UniProtKB/Swiss-Prot annotation:
One Pfam family of this chain: LplA-B_cat
Cross-referenced PROSITE patterns: BPL_LPL_CATALYTIC, LIPB
Organism: Colwellia psychrerythraea (strain 34H / ATCC BAA-681)
Gene3D superfamilies for the chain: Bira Bifunctional Protein, Domain 2 (3.30.930.10)
Record's protein name: Octanoyltransferase
Main location: cytoplasm
Amino acid sequence: MHSNSTIEKSVNSLADSLVIRQLNTMDYSQVWHAMKDFTDNRDDTTADELWLVEHPAVFTQGQAGKAEHLLVPGDIEVVKVDRGGQVTYHGPGQLVVYVMINLRRKKIGVRQLVTLIENSIVSALTDYDIAAYAKADAPGVYVDEKKIASLGLRVRKGCSFHGLAMNVNMDLSPFLRINPCGYAGLEMVQTADLQGPKDTASASTALVKHLINLLKANNVSHQVGLPNENNKYHE
């Protein structure tokens, strides 16, 4: 038998734990299915995770997505997904961070998590003297009214998945084939053009330290590759 104090101590310890998982470049659908499996299989003994990845070119359309926002997808694959929001683009040179957090254990709501993620991005860009900001009416992070980072989350069983995408050093032209996040004419910008990080590795280092800080994670571990299904994602 575990005493209540032992269980509480274990839960508090897990609330402080965070796994940073480097996936390098990986197909969008493969990662999407893996994060759904991770979320479906996790329980109160599963540590929270951040997955860092770049995707080959793909448009993803959220649950609110309307076909008219896909202007000219052309030869780029379109994947309909289960996150909030409209259509966005992922491609090489963009840092994507998937945020798998047990919100009940952290005692935060999804709106608080959105704000935390936005603040982490703003802080990372501030380190490079980039004047970035969030908007109350349009999730994401902006510089001079141009969007530098997009955000889309889903919550299942009290746990978040999906996450953020920050433009680092990429071909931005595919964004012209869509209305990004459902906003016609919304301009996109990237860190490499603003004296910020020139590659996703540098951007990742800058961003992750602020995510760790704002998530109050004191027990951080680093892993490479998708979780091993045999361990059921438990610590």
